[in-house]
Amino acid sequence: MSGDTGPPKQGGTRYGSISSPPSPEPQQAPPGGTYLSEKIPIPDTESGTFSLRKLWAFTGPGFLMSIAFLDPGNIESDLQAGAVAGFKLLWVLLWATVLGLLCQRLAARLGVVTGKDLGEVCHLYYPKVPRILLWLTIELAIVGSDMQEVIGTAIAFSLLSAGRIPLWGGVLITVVDTFFFLFLDNYGLRKLEAFFGFLITIMALTFGYEYVVAQPAQGALLQGLFLPSCPGCGQPELLQAVGIIGAIIMPHNIYLHSSLVKSREVDRSRRADIREANMYFLIEATIALSVSFLINLFVMAVFGQAFYKQTNQAAFNICADSSLHDYAPIFPRNNLTVAVDIYQGGVILGCLFGPPALYIWAVGLLAAGQSSTMTGTYAGQFVMEGFLKLRWSRFARVLLTRSCAILPTVLLAVFRDLRDLSGLNDLLNVLQSLLLPFAVLPILTFTSMPALMQEFANGLVSKVITSSIMVLVCAVNLYFVISYLPSLPHPAYFSLVALLAAAYLGLTTYLVWTCLITQGATLLAHSSHQRFLYGLPEEDQEKGRTSG
Protein backbone atom coordinates (compact mmCIF):
# COMPACT_ATOMS: atom_id res chain seq x y z
CA MET A 1 0.00 0.00 0.00
CA SER A 2 2.99 2.28 -0.19
CA GLY A 3 3.67 4.66 -2.98
CA ASP A 4 3.52 8.38 -3.66
CA THR A 5 0.34 10.16 -4.54
CA GLY A 6 0.37 13.51 -6.25
CA PRO A 7 3.60 15.30 -7.09
CA PRO A 8 6.63 13.29 -5.95
CA LYS A 9 8.23 16.40 -4.49
CA GLN A 10 6.86 19.63 -3.16
CA GLY A 11 9.26 22.38 -2.14
CA GLY A 12 12.18 19.92 -2.15
CA THR A 13 10.40 17.46 0.14
CA ARG A 14 9.18 14.03 -0.92
CA TYR A 15 5.74 13.05 0.33
CA GLY A 16 4.00 9.69 0.45
CA SER A 17 1.88 7.09 2.22
CA ILE A 18 2.21 6.00 5.85
CA SER A 19 0.74 2.53 5.43
CA SER A 20 2.30 0.01 7.75
CA PRO A 21 3.90 -3.17 6.43
CA PRO A 22 1.13 -5.06 4.63
CA SER A 23 1.87 -8.54 5.94
CA PRO A 24 -0.39 -9.43 8.85
CA GLU A 25 2.37 -10.25 11.31
CA PRO A 26 1.18 -10.19 14.93
CA GLN A 27 2.37 -7.17 16.88
CA GLN A 28 4.31 -7.49 20.09
CA ALA A 29 1.95 -7.05 22.99
CA PRO A 30 2.65 -4.02 25.16
CA PRO A 31 2.98 -4.45 28.91
CA GLY A 32 -0.29 -5.81 30.24
CA GLY A 33 -1.50 -6.67 26.73
CA THR A 34 -4.41 -5.16 24.84
CA TYR A 35 -7.38 -6.32 22.85
CA LEU A 36 -5.10 -6.21 19.79
CA SER A 37 -2.52 -8.58 21.23
CA GLU A 38 -4.52 -11.43 19.67
CA LYS A 39 -5.22 -11.59 15.94
CA ILE A 40 -8.22 -13.47 14.54
CA PRO A 41 -7.37 -15.36 11.31
CA ILE A 42 -9.73 -15.01 8.36
CA PRO A 43 -10.64 -18.32 6.62
CA ASP A 44 -9.87 -18.77 2.94
CA THR A 45 -12.95 -19.01 0.76
CA GLU A 46 -13.70 -18.73 -2.94
CA SER A 47 -12.88 -15.23 -4.12
CA GLY A 48 -15.78 -12.96 -5.02
CA THR A 49 -18.44 -14.92 -3.11
CA PHE A 50 -20.18 -14.10 0.15
CA SER A 51 -19.20 -16.40 3.00
CA LEU A 52 -20.95 -16.77 6.36
CA ARG A 53 -17.71 -18.25 7.73
CA LYS A 54 -15.87 -15.07 6.84
CA LEU A 55 -18.63 -12.88 8.21
CA TRP A 56 -18.41 -14.79 11.49
CA ALA A 57 -14.63 -14.27 11.58
CA PHE A 58 -15.11 -10.52 11.10
CA THR A 59 -17.95 -10.37 13.66
CA GLY A 60 -16.98 -8.79 16.96
CA PRO A 61 -15.65 -5.24 16.55
CA GLY A 62 -18.99 -3.90 15.33
CA PHE A 63 -20.89 -5.32 18.29
CA LEU A 64 -18.34 -3.95 20.75
CA MET A 65 -18.64 -0.59 18.99
CA SER A 66 -22.46 -0.76 19.14
CA ILE A 67 -22.36 -0.90 22.94
CA ALA A 68 -21.72 2.86 22.97
CA PHE A 69 -25.16 3.19 21.32
CA LEU A 70 -26.68 1.37 24.32
CA ASP A 71 -25.03 2.91 27.36
CA PRO A 72 -27.06 4.43 30.23
CA GLY A 73 -26.80 7.86 28.62
CA ASN A 74 -28.66 6.54 25.58
CA ILE A 75 -31.26 4.82 27.73
CA GLU A 76 -31.95 8.05 29.62
CA SER A 77 -32.10 10.03 26.38
CA ASP A 78 -34.57 7.49 24.93
CA LEU A 79 -36.95 7.52 27.86
CA GLN A 80 -36.90 11.31 28.14
CA ALA A 81 -37.58 11.68 24.42
CA GLY A 82 -40.55 9.36 24.79
CA ALA A 83 -41.85 11.19 27.86
CA VAL A 84 -41.41 14.66 26.32
CA ALA A 85 -42.47 14.02 22.71
CA GLY A 86 -44.21 10.64 22.65
CA PHE A 87 -43.45 8.93 19.34
CA LYS A 88 -42.71 12.19 17.49
CA LEU A 89 -38.89 11.91 17.70
CA LEU A 90 -38.55 8.26 16.66
CA TRP A 91 -37.42 9.39 13.21
CA VAL A 92 -34.61 11.39 14.83
CA LEU A 93 -33.45 8.20 16.55
CA LEU A 94 -33.57 6.32 13.24
CA TRP A 95 -31.57 8.85 11.27
CA ALA A 96 -29.12 9.51 14.09
CA THR A 97 -28.37 5.77 14.03
CA VAL A 98 -27.91 5.88 10.24
CA LEU A 99 -25.53 8.85 10.57
CA GLY A 100 -23.70 6.97 13.31
CA LEU A 101 -23.31 3.99 10.97
CA LEU A 102 -21.82 6.22 8.27
CA CYS A 103 -19.26 7.61 10.73
CA GLN A 104 -18.38 4.13 12.00
CA ARG A 105 -17.96 2.92 8.41
CA LEU A 106 -15.29 5.57 7.88
CA ALA A 107 -13.57 4.59 11.14
CA ALA A 108 -13.45 0.90 10.18
CA ARG A 109 -12.21 1.73 6.69
CA LEU A 110 -9.34 3.86 8.05
CA GLY A 111 -8.19 1.05 10.33
CA VAL A 112 -8.39 -1.61 7.62
CA VAL A 113 -6.69 0.37 4.84
CA THR A 114 -3.85 1.94 6.83
CA GLY A 115 -3.39 -0.62 9.61
CA LYS A 116 -3.52 2.32 12.04
CA ASP A 117 -6.27 3.70 14.22
CA LEU A 118 -7.48 7.29 14.18
CA GLY A 119 -5.37 8.29 17.19
CA GLU A 120 -2.19 7.00 15.53
CA VAL A 121 -2.94 8.87 12.30
CA CYS A 122 -3.68 12.06 14.24
CA HIS A 123 -0.30 11.67 15.97
CA LEU A 124 1.48 11.51 12.61
CA TYR A 125 -0.33 14.34 10.83
CA TYR A 126 -1.34 17.01 13.34
CA PRO A 127 1.22 19.38 14.94
CA LYS A 128 1.87 19.02 18.67
CA VAL A 129 -0.45 21.70 20.10
CA PRO A 130 -3.65 20.76 18.22
CA ARG A 131 -2.77 17.09 18.71
CA ILE A 132 -2.57 17.47 22.51
CA LEU A 133 -5.77 19.54 22.62
CA LEU A 134 -7.53 16.94 20.49
CA TRP A 135 -6.34 14.17 22.79
CA LEU A 136 -7.63 16.06 25.86
CA THR A 137 -11.08 16.52 24.32
CA ILE A 138 -11.39 12.80 23.57
CA GLU A 139 -10.19 11.90 27.06
CA LEU A 140 -12.89 14.25 28.38
CA ALA A 141 -15.46 12.43 26.25
CA ILE A 142 -14.26 9.07 27.61
CA VAL A 143 -14.44 10.22 31.24
CA GLY A 144 -17.91 11.68 30.57
CA SER A 145 -19.07 8.39 29.10
CA ASP A 146 -17.59 6.49 32.03
CA MET A 147 -19.49 8.73 34.46
CA GLN A 148 -22.72 7.79 32.68
CA GLU A 149 -21.87 4.11 33.07
CA VAL A 150 -21.20 4.62 36.78
CA ILE A 151 -24.50 6.50 37.24
CA GLY A 152 -26.52 3.89 35.35
CA THR A 153 -24.97 0.99 37.24
CA ALA A 154 -25.45 2.68 40.64
CA ILE A 155 -29.14 3.35 39.91
CA ALA A 156 -29.58 -0.26 38.72
CA PHE A 157 -28.14 -1.58 41.99
CA SER A 158 -30.43 0.75 43.95
CA LEU A 159 -33.51 -0.52 42.08
CA LEU A 160 -32.53 -4.19 42.35
CA SER A 161 -31.94 -3.87 46.10
CA ALA A 162 -35.14 -1.87 46.70
CA GLY A 163 -32.99 1.03 47.93
CA ARG A 164 -30.92 -1.05 50.36
CA ILE A 165 -27.78 -0.25 48.38
CA PRO A 166 -27.37 3.55 48.52
CA LEU A 167 -26.34 5.39 45.39
CA TRP A 168 -22.84 6.03 46.69
CA GLY A 169 -22.54 2.31 47.45
CA GLY A 170 -23.53 1.46 43.88
CA VAL A 171 -20.93 3.91 42.61
CA LEU A 172 -18.19 2.20 44.65
CA ILE A 173 -19.30 -1.26 43.48
CA THR A 174 -18.47 -0.22 39.91
CA VAL A 175 -14.79 -0.18 40.88
CA VAL A 176 -14.95 -3.91 41.64
CA ASP A 177 -16.87 -4.91 38.51
CA THR A 178 -14.38 -3.09 36.29
CA PHE A 179 -11.53 -5.28 37.49
CA PHE A 180 -13.71 -8.35 36.93
CA PHE A 181 -13.82 -7.43 33.25
CA LEU A 182 -10.06 -7.02 33.18
CA PHE A 183 -9.82 -10.55 34.57
CA LEU A 184 -12.26 -11.82 31.92
CA ASP A 185 -10.13 -10.27 29.19
CA ASN A 186 -7.33 -12.76 29.95
CA TYR A 187 -9.44 -15.61 28.57
CA GLY A 188 -9.10 -14.51 24.96
CA LEU A 189 -10.56 -12.11 22.46
CA ARG A 190 -13.40 -14.27 21.11
CA LYS A 191 -14.64 -15.14 24.60
CA LEU A 192 -14.64 -11.46 25.53
CA GLU A 193 -16.60 -10.59 22.38
CA ALA A 194 -19.05 -13.41 23.15
CA PHE A 195 -19.59 -12.05 26.66
CA PHE A 196 -20.45 -8.63 25.30
CA GLY A 197 -22.83 -10.29 22.85
CA PHE A 198 -24.46 -11.93 25.87
CA LEU A 199 -24.92 -8.54 27.58
CA ILE A 200 -26.47 -7.08 24.41
CA THR A 201 -28.85 -10.07 24.34
CA ILE A 202 -29.86 -9.34 27.95
CA MET A 203 -30.67 -5.75 26.99
CA ALA A 204 -32.69 -6.87 23.97
CA LEU A 205 -34.70 -9.35 26.08
CA THR A 206 -35.30 -7.05 29.07
CA PHE A 207 -36.22 -3.91 27.15
CA GLY A 208 -38.13 -6.06 24.63
CA TYR A 209 -40.17 -7.42 27.54
CA GLU A 210 -41.06 -3.87 28.60
CA TYR A 211 -42.13 -3.14 25.01
CA VAL A 212 -44.43 -6.18 24.94
CA VAL A 213 -46.13 -5.42 28.26
CA ALA A 214 -46.51 -1.69 27.48
CA GLN A 215 -48.17 -2.43 24.10
CA PRO A 216 -47.40 0.88 22.33
CA ALA A 217 -49.86 2.04 19.68
CA GLN A 218 -48.28 0.59 16.54
CA GLY A 219 -49.88 3.00 14.07
CA ALA A 220 -48.66 6.10 15.90
CA LEU A 221 -45.26 4.44 16.38
CA LEU A 222 -44.80 3.77 12.66
CA GLN A 223 -45.91 7.31 11.84
CA GLY A 224 -43.35 8.76 14.26
CA LEU A 225 -40.67 6.48 12.85
CA PHE A 226 -41.07 7.20 9.14
CA LEU A 227 -42.61 10.68 8.95
CA PRO A 228 -39.90 13.30 9.73
CA SER A 229 -42.08 15.88 11.44
CA CYS A 230 -42.86 17.04 14.95
CA PRO A 231 -46.27 18.78 15.05
CA GLY A 232 -46.77 21.02 18.06
CA CYS A 233 -43.14 20.72 19.17
CA GLY A 234 -41.27 23.53 20.90
CA GLN A 235 -37.91 24.08 22.56
CA PRO A 236 -38.15 21.08 24.97
CA GLU A 237 -38.64 18.68 22.07
CA LEU A 238 -35.88 20.31 20.04
CA LEU A 239 -33.42 20.10 22.93
CA GLN A 240 -34.40 16.46 23.34
CA ALA A 241 -33.57 15.86 19.67
CA VAL A 242 -30.14 17.39 20.34
CA GLY A 243 -29.72 14.96 23.24
CA ILE A 244 -30.57 11.99 21.00
CA ILE A 245 -27.86 12.93 18.51
CA GLY A 246 -25.31 13.48 21.28
CA ALA A 247 -26.16 10.15 22.92
CA ILE A 248 -26.11 8.10 19.71
CA ILE A 249 -23.00 9.44 17.92
CA MET A 250 -20.24 9.40 20.54
CA PRO A 251 -16.80 10.85 19.72
CA HIS A 252 -14.60 8.24 21.42
CA ASN A 253 -16.50 5.45 19.66
CA ILE A 254 -15.07 6.51 16.29
CA TYR A 255 -11.54 6.22 17.67
CA LEU A 256 -12.44 2.88 19.27
CA HIS A 257 -13.84 1.27 16.12
CA SER A 258 -10.84 2.28 13.99
CA SER A 259 -8.67 0.33 16.43
CA LEU A 260 -10.93 -2.68 17.00
CA VAL A 261 -10.86 -3.68 13.32
CA LYS A 262 -7.08 -4.15 13.57
CA SER A 263 -7.74 -7.35 15.54
CA ARG A 264 -8.46 -9.23 12.29
CA GLU A 265 -5.69 -10.54 10.05
CA VAL A 266 -6.08 -8.73 6.74
CA ASP A 267 -3.37 -8.97 4.08
CA ARG A 268 -3.11 -5.32 3.10
CA SER A 269 -0.77 -6.12 0.22
CA ARG A 270 -3.87 -7.41 -1.60
CA ARG A 271 -6.43 -4.80 -2.64
CA ALA A 272 -9.11 -7.51 -2.94
CA ASP A 273 -8.60 -8.50 0.71
CA ILE A 274 -8.91 -4.88 1.84
CA ARG A 275 -12.08 -4.42 -0.20
CA GLU A 276 -13.50 -7.65 1.22
CA ALA A 277 -12.66 -6.67 4.81
CA ASN A 278 -14.36 -3.29 4.32
CA MET A 279 -17.48 -5.06 3.04
CA TYR A 280 -17.70 -7.57 5.90
CA PHE A 281 -17.03 -4.95 8.56
CA LEU A 282 -19.80 -2.78 7.07
CA ILE A 283 -22.25 -5.70 7.08
CA GLU A 284 -21.36 -6.53 10.68
CA ALA A 285 -21.67 -2.90 11.80
CA THR A 286 -25.05 -2.63 10.05
CA ILE A 287 -26.36 -5.72 11.85
CA ALA A 288 -24.98 -4.56 15.21
CA LEU A 289 -26.43 -1.05 14.92
CA SER A 290 -29.77 -2.45 13.73
CA VAL A 291 -29.93 -4.41 16.99
CA SER A 292 -28.96 -1.33 19.00
CA PHE A 293 -31.60 0.72 17.16
CA LEU A 294 -34.32 -1.80 18.05
CA ILE A 295 -33.31 -1.71 21.72
CA ASN A 296 -33.36 2.10 21.77
CA LEU A 297 -36.70 1.99 19.93
CA PHE A 298 -38.13 -0.33 22.60
CA VAL A 299 -37.21 2.13 25.35
CA MET A 300 -38.44 5.26 23.58
CA ALA A 301 -41.71 3.60 22.55
CA VAL A 302 -42.41 2.25 26.05
CA PHE A 303 -42.04 5.66 27.64
CA GLY A 304 -43.82 7.39 24.78
CA GLN A 305 -46.77 5.16 25.60
CA ALA A 306 -46.57 5.15 29.41
CA PHE A 307 -45.23 8.62 30.24
CA TYR A 308 -46.19 11.04 27.46
CA LYS A 309 -47.99 14.06 28.98
CA GLN A 310 -48.14 12.26 32.33
CA THR A 311 -48.36 14.56 35.36
CA ASN A 312 -46.59 14.06 38.67
CA GLN A 313 -49.95 13.68 40.42
CA ALA A 314 -51.06 10.98 37.99
CA ALA A 315 -47.77 9.10 38.47
CA PHE A 316 -48.17 9.42 42.25
CA ASN A 317 -51.70 8.01 42.09
CA ILE A 318 -50.64 5.09 39.88
CA CYS A 319 -47.89 4.08 42.30
CA ALA A 320 -50.00 4.72 45.40
CA ASP A 321 -52.62 2.26 44.08
CA SER A 322 -50.04 -0.41 43.19
CA SER A 323 -48.03 -2.96 45.16
CA LEU A 324 -45.07 -0.55 44.92
CA HIS A 325 -46.88 2.19 46.88
CA ASP A 326 -43.74 2.90 48.94
CA TYR A 327 -42.24 4.50 45.81
CA ALA A 328 -45.13 6.95 45.30
CA PRO A 329 -43.50 9.85 47.25
CA ILE A 330 -40.73 10.18 44.64
CA PHE A 331 -43.34 11.94 42.47
CA PRO A 332 -44.34 15.43 43.73
CA ARG A 333 -48.09 15.90 44.13
CA ASN A 334 -48.59 18.60 41.50
CA ASN A 335 -49.89 18.86 37.96
CA LEU A 336 -46.53 19.53 36.30
CA THR A 337 -45.41 17.11 33.60
CA VAL A 338 -43.21 14.34 34.96
CA ALA A 339 -39.47 15.02 34.51
CA VAL A 340 -38.57 11.37 34.11
CA ASP A 341 -35.15 9.78 34.62
CA ILE A 342 -33.82 6.22 34.57
CA TYR A 343 -34.72 5.70 38.24
CA GLN A 344 -38.26 7.05 38.04
CA GLY A 345 -38.65 5.24 34.73
CA GLY A 346 -38.08 1.87 36.36
CA VAL A 347 -40.43 2.75 39.23
CA ILE A 348 -43.34 3.81 37.01
CA LEU A 349 -42.95 0.66 34.89
CA GLY A 350 -43.20 -1.39 38.08
CA CYS A 351 -46.25 0.58 39.21
CA LEU A 352 -47.98 0.16 35.85
CA PHE A 353 -47.07 -3.41 34.96
CA GLY A 354 -46.08 -5.03 38.25
CA PRO A 355 -42.82 -5.48 40.20
CA PRO A 356 -41.27 -7.82 37.57
CA ALA A 357 -41.22 -4.90 35.13
CA LEU A 358 -39.16 -2.84 37.61
CA TYR A 359 -36.61 -5.57 38.24
CA ILE A 360 -36.34 -6.51 34.57
CA TRP A 361 -35.76 -2.83 33.77
CA ALA A 362 -33.01 -2.70 36.40
CA VAL A 363 -31.33 -5.81 34.95
CA GLY A 364 -31.35 -4.23 31.48
CA LEU A 365 -29.94 -1.00 32.90
CA LEU A 366 -27.24 -2.96 34.74
CA ALA A 367 -26.30 -4.75 31.50
CA ALA A 368 -26.11 -1.37 29.72
CA GLY A 369 -23.76 0.04 32.35
CA GLN A 370 -21.60 -3.05 32.59
CA SER A 371 -21.21 -3.57 28.85
CA SER A 372 -20.06 0.02 28.40
CA THR A 373 -17.39 -0.27 31.08
CA MET A 374 -14.84 -2.35 29.20
CA THR A 375 -15.26 -0.65 25.83
CA GLY A 376 -14.61 2.69 27.54
CA THR A 377 -11.43 1.23 29.01
CA TYR A 378 -10.28 0.06 25.59
CA ALA A 379 -11.13 3.40 23.99
CA GLY A 380 -9.03 5.21 26.59
CA GLN A 381 -6.12 2.84 26.10
CA PHE A 382 -6.18 3.08 22.30
CA VAL A 383 -6.50 6.88 22.35
CA MET A 384 -3.60 7.26 24.79
CA GLU A 385 -1.38 4.88 22.82
CA GLY A 386 -2.31 6.48 19.50
CA PHE A 387 -1.93 10.14 20.41
CA LEU A 388 0.92 9.96 22.92
CA LYS A 389 2.68 6.66 22.11
CA LEU A 390 2.32 6.07 25.84
CA ARG A 391 1.52 2.49 26.73
CA TRP A 392 0.03 1.72 30.11
CA SER A 393 -1.22 -1.55 31.47
CA ARG A 394 -5.00 -1.96 31.36
CA PHE A 395 -5.01 -1.90 35.17
CA ALA A 396 -3.36 1.54 35.31
CA ARG A 397 -5.51 2.88 32.50
CA VAL A 398 -8.82 1.78 34.00
CA LEU A 399 -7.73 3.04 37.43
CA LEU A 400 -7.13 6.52 35.99
CA THR A 401 -10.35 6.71 33.96
CA ARG A 402 -12.59 5.22 36.62
CA SER A 403 -11.07 7.44 39.35
CA CYS A 404 -11.81 10.56 37.29
CA ALA A 405 -15.37 9.33 36.76
CA ILE A 406 -16.09 8.15 40.30
CA LEU A 407 -14.86 11.15 42.31
CA PRO A 408 -17.44 13.72 41.11
CA THR A 409 -20.15 11.05 40.87
CA VAL A 410 -19.73 9.77 44.42
CA LEU A 411 -19.68 13.36 45.76
CA LEU A 412 -23.01 14.01 44.05
CA ALA A 413 -24.38 10.70 45.31
CA VAL A 414 -23.41 11.50 48.92
CA PHE A 415 -24.25 15.19 49.17
CA ARG A 416 -27.02 15.62 46.60
CA ASP A 417 -30.06 13.60 45.57
CA LEU A 418 -30.99 11.27 42.74
CA ARG A 419 -32.37 14.07 40.59
CA ASP A 420 -28.95 15.78 40.56
CA LEU A 421 -27.35 12.50 39.50
CA SER A 422 -29.82 12.06 36.64
CA GLY A 423 -29.39 15.73 35.70
CA LEU A 424 -25.66 15.09 35.41
CA ASN A 425 -26.49 12.28 32.97
CA ASP A 426 -28.38 14.75 30.76
CA LEU A 427 -25.49 17.23 30.86
CA LEU A 428 -23.04 14.49 29.87
CA ASN A 429 -25.17 13.66 26.81
CA VAL A 430 -24.89 17.28 25.71
CA LEU A 431 -21.13 17.19 26.38
CA GLN A 432 -20.80 14.24 23.97
CA SER A 433 -22.60 16.23 21.29
CA LEU A 434 -20.35 19.26 21.83
CA LEU A 435 -17.21 17.11 21.53
CA LEU A 436 -18.40 15.23 18.44
CA PRO A 437 -16.63 17.53 15.91
CA PHE A 438 -13.29 16.43 17.38
CA ALA A 439 -13.93 12.92 16.10
CA VAL A 440 -15.97 13.50 12.95
CA LEU A 441 -13.66 16.17 11.48
CA PRO A 442 -10.46 14.07 11.81
CA ILE A 443 -12.09 10.91 10.41
CA LEU A 444 -13.52 12.87 7.48
CA THR A 445 -10.13 14.52 6.91
CA PHE A 446 -8.06 11.35 6.80
CA THR A 447 -10.50 9.14 4.90
CA SER A 448 -10.66 11.83 2.20
CA MET A 449 -6.88 11.79 1.61
CA PRO A 450 -5.86 9.84 -1.53
CA ALA A 451 -2.24 9.91 -0.31
CA LEU A 452 -3.34 7.95 2.75
CA MET A 453 -6.32 5.90 1.56
CA GLN A 454 -5.41 5.65 -2.14
CA GLU A 455 -8.31 4.09 -4.09
CA PHE A 456 -10.31 3.71 -0.86
CA ALA A 457 -10.51 7.47 -0.22
CA ASN A 458 -13.98 9.00 0.13
CA GLY A 459 -15.79 9.65 -3.12
CA LEU A 460 -17.88 12.73 -3.83
CA VAL A 461 -21.12 11.29 -2.44
CA SER A 462 -19.44 10.15 0.78
CA LYS A 463 -17.78 13.56 1.21
CA VAL A 464 -21.09 15.37 0.74
CA ILE A 465 -22.93 13.13 3.23
CA THR A 466 -20.27 13.24 5.94
CA SER A 467 -19.75 16.98 5.48
CA SER A 468 -23.51 17.44 5.87
CA ILE A 469 -23.33 15.46 9.12
CA MET A 470 -20.64 17.81 10.35
CA VAL A 471 -22.63 20.93 9.44
CA LEU A 472 -25.68 19.46 11.18
CA VAL A 473 -23.71 18.68 14.34
CA CYS A 474 -22.18 22.17 14.45
CA ALA A 475 -25.60 23.79 13.92
CA VAL A 476 -27.13 21.67 16.68
CA ASN A 477 -24.30 22.54 19.06
CA LEU A 478 -24.59 26.26 18.28
CA TYR A 479 -28.31 26.12 18.97
CA PHE A 480 -27.70 24.40 22.30
CA VAL A 481 -25.11 26.97 23.43
CA ILE A 482 -27.43 29.86 22.53
CA SER A 483 -30.30 28.16 24.37
CA TYR A 484 -28.13 27.37 27.39
CA LEU A 485 -26.68 30.85 27.98
CA PRO A 486 -29.84 32.39 29.53
CA SER A 487 -29.89 29.60 32.14
CA LEU A 488 -26.46 30.46 33.57
CA PRO A 489 -26.89 31.15 37.31
CA HIS A 490 -24.58 34.17 37.51
CA PRO A 491 -23.12 36.68 35.00
CA ALA A 492 -19.61 35.70 36.13
CA TYR A 493 -20.12 32.38 34.39
CA PHE A 494 -20.27 34.17 31.04
CA SER A 495 -16.53 34.88 31.14
CA LEU A 496 -15.77 31.20 31.75
CA VAL A 497 -18.11 30.15 28.94
CA ALA A 498 -16.50 32.75 26.65
CA LEU A 499 -13.02 31.39 27.42
CA LEU A 500 -14.07 27.80 26.77
CA ALA A 501 -15.93 28.85 23.62
CA ALA A 502 -12.81 30.60 22.27
CA ALA A 503 -10.68 27.47 22.78
CA TYR A 504 -13.44 25.30 21.32
CA LEU A 505 -13.87 27.46 18.23
CA GLY A 506 -10.10 27.76 17.75
CA LEU A 507 -9.54 24.01 17.66
CA THR A 508 -12.66 23.44 15.55
CA THR A 509 -11.51 26.08 13.05
CA TYR A 510 -8.11 24.40 12.73
CA LEU A 511 -9.70 21.00 12.14
CA VAL A 512 -12.09 22.47 9.55
CA TRP A 513 -9.13 24.12 7.80
CA THR A 514 -7.17 20.87 7.50
CA CYS A 515 -10.34 19.05 6.46
CA LEU A 516 -10.96 21.56 3.65
CA ILE A 517 -7.42 20.94 2.38
CA THR A 518 -8.21 17.26 1.91
CA GLN A 519 -11.49 18.16 0.21
CA GLY A 520 -9.56 19.98 -2.53
CA ALA A 521 -8.98 23.50 -1.16
CA THR A 522 -5.29 23.38 -2.13
CA LEU A 523 -4.77 27.13 -1.63
CA LEU A 524 -5.11 26.58 2.12
CA ALA A 525 -2.16 24.19 2.25
CA HIS A 526 1.03 25.90 3.41
CA SER A 527 4.40 24.62 4.69
CA SER A 528 3.95 21.55 6.90
CA HIS A 529 0.30 21.21 5.93
CA GLN A 530 1.31 20.00 2.47
CA ARG A 531 1.12 16.57 4.10
CA PHE A 532 -2.68 16.81 4.02
CA LEU A 533 -2.41 16.86 0.23
CA TYR A 534 0.54 14.59 -0.53
CA GLY A 535 1.07 12.47 2.58
CA LEU A 536 3.88 12.50 5.12
CA PRO A 537 7.29 13.95 4.26
CA GLU A 538 9.82 11.27 3.33
CA GLU A 539 11.66 11.51 6.66
CA ASP A 540 8.41 10.74 8.54
CA GLN A 541 7.23 7.87 6.35
CA GLU A 542 9.41 5.19 7.95
CA LYS A 543 8.35 6.39 11.40
CA GLY A 544 4.74 6.10 10.27
CA ARG A 545 5.26 2.55 9.00
CA THR A 546 6.97 1.29 12.13
CA SER A 547 5.04 3.18 14.83
CA GLY A 548 2.22 1.64 16.81
From Swiss-Prot:
Residues the record marks as carrying a glycan: 335
Major location category of this protein: membrane
Matches recorded under InterPro entries: NRAMP_fam
Pfam families: Nramp
Ranges facing Cytoplasmic side: 1-55, 103-139, 185-193, 257-284, 367-397, 448-463, 514-548
Coiled coil (UniProt feature): none
Protein name listed in UniProt: Natural resistance-associated macrophage protein 1
Organism annotation: Bos taurus
